[in-house]
Amino acid sequence: MANYYDSNKATVAKSKGFMLGNQEQHFPSEGLYLGDLTGGSITLPALYDLNSGKGLCFLYNNEHSQRQANACLERLACRIALTVPSHLCDLVIYNGGDPSNAFMVHSRMNKHIMGNRNERIFFDGNLDAFRELLNEAYASVIERMSNIRLAGKRDLVELNESLGNDARLKYQFFILADFPGFMNMDAINRLTQIVEAGSKAGVFVLMSFDMRANIVDAYSSAPFNPQRLLSNMQVLVPQGNSFSFRNSGHDEVINRFNYVPGAPD
């Protein structure tokens, strides 16, 4: 299939280009656009399926792959804000890097995009507030999963589809740039717990991870092992100027193509 969009409707969530005024009001179950997969004369979109039950993590090991990963995260945040209905969307953005790096500043996420969503941006000075929010999100995951099982549903998306508009629960999106910047082990462990079960409960974590970071548990002096966190995420690993996929369920097929993250509009 030479051109995916010849036979598939280009939506805000999955299309390569989109107009900020063209907002759609639905859960983006068709996937979020990450960039293009290219191989020979074939070009296909790389899509992240929010409903896969896994989070999404870009690994990076230098400034170039960091810029690529964070630019794609910005674009994903915009697509989420443009697609998920405002009364069902709680968008939390955490900047673990230098506050001067302008990742997802308020001026970039303008009111036309955000509408009345609960946009909350945290830097290192607000880590206590962010950690409290992680605790609230984890408690919410436990409660939601109980309600989902009682209703005999697979996940929150399926549960919400069976409820009236006023009864539907919000989807919560955590966008984390430059993890683990400024986060202590308590916050990291809580985030890991959220990633393990959060997607099915409508709590989604999309992040970039600085592989150069030295994370040590202050209690045991042992280094942090990221395997528990990353095993529950679709992971994109830097390979020169591109990235390869891990833990997507289709790694062997996808990695026959060259993938470069989509640049911001």
Annotate the PLM regions.
Residues 17-154, 161-261:
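P-loop NTPase catalytic phosphate-binding loop
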Residues 265:
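Conserved glycine-bearing catalytic or ligand-binding loops at nucleotide- and phosphate-handling centers
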Residues 2-25:
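Long, low-complexity segments enriched in small/aliphatic residues
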Residues 2-4, 154-157:
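Long, charged, glycine-rich C-terminal linkers/tails
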